[in-house]
Amino acid sequence: MAEETGALPSRTDFSAWYNEVIRRADIMDVRYPVKGLYVWYPFGFALRNHTYTLLRSLLNRDHEETLFPLLIPETEFMKEAEHIKGFEDEVYWVTHGGLSPLDVKLALRPTSETAIYPMYALWVRSHADLPLKLYQVVNTFRYETKHTRPLIRLREITSFMESHTVHTDWDDANKQVEYELGLATEFYRDLGVPIIISRRPDWDKFPGADFTMAIDAVMPDGRTLQIGTVHHLGDHFSTTYNITYEDVNGEQKLASQTCFGISERCIAAIIAVHGDDKGLVLPATVAPTQVVIIPIIVGKRGDEIMAAVEKLESELKAAGLRVKTDARDMRPGAKYYHWELHGVPLRVELGPRDLDNNQLVCANRLGVKTTIPRENAADSVKRLLDEAHDQILEKAEDHLSSHLKTVKTVDECNQSLEENIVIVHWCGEKACADKLEELTNSSLLGTGVRSKYVVDDEGPCIVCGKPGKTALVGRSY
């Protein structure tokens, strides 16, 4: 965590920039001696905690938090054949307790359906028990064989929020799907991250789901990052695990279910979507430090300035802001570099001239400078933080809209995919999707697109020319 100076790689080389900013901005240390497992630095973990506090505050309106075990007996894990087929080559198995072989192998959860649903079968008895809406934030393990990358592709996902709900029927579960998509939209708006929602094609849906709705963000290089999913499970798992209830007529009915997940990819999205060549650009909603105060010590007025700084810090903290004063014995420029690298939303400078004029000089992370009166500083600072959030959201929206391209031919699709998500029409046939993916080295992301920048309409399929509907094509992390 030693301070480094010098410029970061340009963000136009996104991979190099991302790896370097993760390290130099104290997010994660990648040197742990197991591939795909990383260590949170305290600063990165604080960012993670503020982000998940925000997520929990939204979930707690409609869910209750719980915690299920990490280990899943093979007997329960193997009950759901279709589900397991989607994970079987990624599972870590515990085969011994000490030196003794276990009678039943234990899986480290890749996801928790097979841990949670046997318990739901015990808990749900009557329609009065429904809906049941629980979530947990846990670590999960998947034996990734692809190239691993901090926060994006991991073998240990350290912060997986998974919601699991149970409902009386398919329609009520579908309302929950819509609710959770709305929750995710609000969450990412609070992070300043614009998203695109679409329905994944059937061959790419969650194993065992009726359908999957996916939430994608656009990275600086035009690739997509899946940063959330909501799955309508129908009665698939309730059939396997016998999750039934007695309805108002005294009849036994199978329940319908949903699940919803967001991992620490939400942190990757914050870093990637907002960052610049100076480092992180953090939204004030989750920044570990929202305001840094820089004393400008000139001449013999140091004690007077520091007294004013301490008073200002106390006032801002009393207003509920996360504030630090950087009183280190170093040039102001070096301090600016440090706090810009770490993405602090607002810098407040206080020197002799500001003291004499009863003012504060403020600069937000995008470089917008403002002078505010010292009186009622907390109100002014909060307003500037709100304005800074609006500015980074607008910048991110501009990036998203500029990286969406509508095309009519496969050749146009191929050319546009270098830096964009491509909007096409597709007939719905897997053969056409397979051909398009093969010719363009891309993935058909989904249909039923929800974005203010995408018109969900009809047109001739880009491959066969038959009637089709709007679909997204992209290259993904």
From Swiss-Prot:
Among its keywords, does the record have ATP-binding? yes
SMART domains in UniProt:
ProRS-C_1
Residues spanning the membrane: none
**Keywords noted in UniProt:** Aminoacyl-tRNA synthetase, ATP-binding, Cytoplasm, Ligase, Nucleotide-binding, Protein biosynthesis
PROSITE patterns documented for this protein: AA_TRNA_LIGASE_II
Catalytic activities: tRNA(Pro) + L-proline + ATP = L-prolyl-tRNA(Pro) + AMP + diphosphate
At the top level of its lineage, which domain of life is listed? Archaea
Q: Under the GO molecular function aspect, what terms does this record hold?
A: ATP binding; proline-tRNA ligase activity
Q: Which family does it belong to?
A: Belongs to the class-II aminoacyl-tRNA synthetase family. ProS type 3 subfamily.
Q: What does this protein do?
A: Catalyzes the attachment of proline to tRNA(Pro) in a two-step reaction: proline is first activated by ATP to form Pro-AMP and then transferred to the acceptor end of tRNA(Pro).
Q: How does it assemble?
A: Homodimer.
| Protein name per Swiss-Prot or TrEMBL | Proline--tRNA ligase
The species this protein belongs to is: Methanocorpusculum labreanum (strain ATCC 43576 / DSM 4855 / Z)
